[in-house]
Amino acid sequence: MTVPDSVGTFAAQAVVAFRRAKGAPDSLALDLVGLTVDSVTAPGASRAARQERRPFAYDGRKLRIGLRPRRGTGVESVVVFYHGAPADGLFLRPDARGRPSAFADDWPDRARDWLPTVDDPADKAPVRWEVSVPAGWRVVANGRFVRRDAAGGGRATWTYDERSPIPTYTMVLGAGRMTASRHRPAVLGNDSVPIEVWAEPEDSAFADSVPFRRATEIVETMERLVGPFPFEKLAEVESSTRYGGMENSTAIFYPEQPYVARRLSEGVVRHETAHQWFGDAVTERDFHDLWLSEGFADYFAVVVGAALDGDSVMRRGVAGLMRGYLRSPVVGRPLVDSAETVLTRLLNANSYNKGACVLHMLRRTVGDSAFWRGIRAYYREYRDSSVSSADFQRVMERAAGRQLGWFFTEWLHQPGYPQLDVAWRWDSAGRRLSIDVTQTQPAAWGLFTLPALTLEVAGGSGPPIQRTIALSSARQSVQWDAPERPTDVRVDPDGDWLLTAQVHSQP
């Protein structure tokens, strides 16, 4: 790919490798939007014809390439020569200080605006970049840095190679006048992961000392919790992404504005780093299962923060996730919302906050040992591939040694959350406390099962008394001895469950 010296068009040739499925037609369809296709070639039928032109049809959205009749089951390839000014996906524009730059930004389906691909999260592929830029520029991209070659005309070509299959929405490059610093590598056993911080020169000191100060420790913590880092390096990059952070494989892009304002937080860094495991290495097969990416990243941002800074981070973090969901406009829709057709609308509190809370509640349901056994098995089994919520459920059921269909049905496919009315009364004659718990959420949300709901009763001179009940019906009553009248009854005092509760006493 040739990136221009200033804002304008680019030119590229893409080598697309593929295998034909049995019975597939003698053609290849690629997503490519709004560019000019100059020609398409493929290896010739003989050694004398090393490359030959292939017929193609291009309607501005789909590129259909005619292929020779299938000659086996091996890997084939075509080369697409094209150019243009992308309307989206690859942004050739000035950086925050007015210098020319180029940055890709592909989620959810904008790789097709500049790359001829099968632009679908279920179709992952390795990628190799050879990017020609002005000699004073630097280039960052997916994978291992291979080399920088000087070229004529005051230009240089940078080569990167990512050998693991990654989703097209994380296939990116960034180019411009940037600085790059190396932090201490992340080490797990005999493996070492280079950690790089890329920024505009004016922002490099801030980037190194504030948001990415513990970038290495974050990676090492994730490795201990989940498994080995899945790629060759991790670069933290100041860019022109439209998102608060974009988890591109091996090269996370962050927007310029928080750098300029000196407000980029470590919480965002933990979230995006967690995506390297969940989203990049293990990718949702369908965007309606986006919680497998965003919910995981939100939860592990909190878990890693707690591992680094103490359990209070866990309590505050989970409580914040729950508050964010309960205040959101999507509580009336299921987490896995297959009716939503606008993909960007899936970037909501269901996919993020509720998805993270589902993991926390699953952990409370099966216990720490089974939860972590399942998480590690899930990553190990599905690394470098694509998954569904059903795949995750199967792994967790195996780890827990029991069926969890009720849990995933209620929390993924039913909308809403439990709304509880909790009425208590104290019998002074019998010294007994009675508590009635009623689910009052809209009928369309259905009922929820809370297998270990804690009730805490305070009163008298002694410490609060806690009892755990299994709530599995619309209404449940419990009684126990209470020598003194309670002064307070609390529901789920540790914040383990995504719910609301109205507590009141009865005469």
Residue ranges of model-derived segments:
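A surface-exposed beta-strand-loop module
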Residues: 27-28, 32-98, 152-159, 471-485, ...
